């Protein structure tokens, strides 16, 4: 048997959370990450599992995730400290066979629970499992500074926000041709915001929480991080453009269409019409 601290998924979570903190996206205990695992992923590390795994109930049944394994950041844990004490900052859990609760097999050595946004993560995992036929395994939430800033000055609709980011950096249309979904401002840590986010996840791999942060998804931690990083870089460009007096020229609709054709992606039609 191998030590779970050396596993690819624990090491991956350490790197992702450290990178997110270094980017300035996750102050204090802000942000949360979940990675869906397979039984094959976790089996080599069973010797590190708790002999009496703690059981917790879910706020609502999620039978679609029955028996699924996850590694998740802990509630109240600081991303800057994950690398110092991953066994306290992270948690490996398995959803019950009836989807009504979960058991904690490893992590949270000083007590606590998984992220307070667990419902939002699980609801989005369910949607993305269906949309991508199981390919997407990561849900990532952070407080990306410039995306939050733009939520104060742009119209809060998908077409407008997406178009602004597409124009901010040429690669954006290629990386997220499906655009950015947007939910209204809502109280975090609730089933309601999870419902609204997962509804947007049916059509978008990025979902903005105005005045709060961003949700991203992908098949790997690197892909989800890179998706958010790309959108945030474009948002930073557009914040600077606005501070310099606004656009004098930009990427045209015809050029965006040509870009999509070159890279074999289908741009969100509503954003092309803005």
From Swiss-Prot:
GO terms for cellular component: cytosol. Zn(2+) binds at residues 141, 143, 212. The keyword Signal does not apply. Keywords: Cytoplasm, Lyase, Metal-binding, Rhamnose metabolism, Zinc. Its cofactor is Zn(2+). It is found in: Cytoplasm. It catalyses: L-rhamnulose 1-phosphate = (S)-lactaldehyde + dihydroxyacetone phosphate. The active site is at residue 117. Its EC number is 4.1.2.19. Binds 1 zinc ion per subunit. It comes from the Bacteria. Pathway: Carbohydrate degradation; L-rhamnose degradation; glycerone phosphate from L-rhamnose: step 3/3. One of its GO terms (biological process) is rhamnose catabolic process. SUPFAM superfamilies: AraD/HMP-PK domain-like (SSF53639). The keyword Zinc applies. One of its GO terms (molecular function) is metal ion binding. HAMAP family: RhaD. Belongs to the aldolase class II family. RhaD subfamily. NCBIfam families: PRK03634.1, rhamnu_1P_ald. Catalyzes the reversible cleavage of L-rhamnulose-1-phosphate to dihydroxyacetone phosphate (DHAP) and L-lactaldehyde. Homotetramer. This is Rhamnulose-1-phosphate aldolase. It comes from Pectobacterium atrosepticum (strain SCRI 1043 / ATCC BAA-672) (Erwinia carotovora subsp. atroseptica).
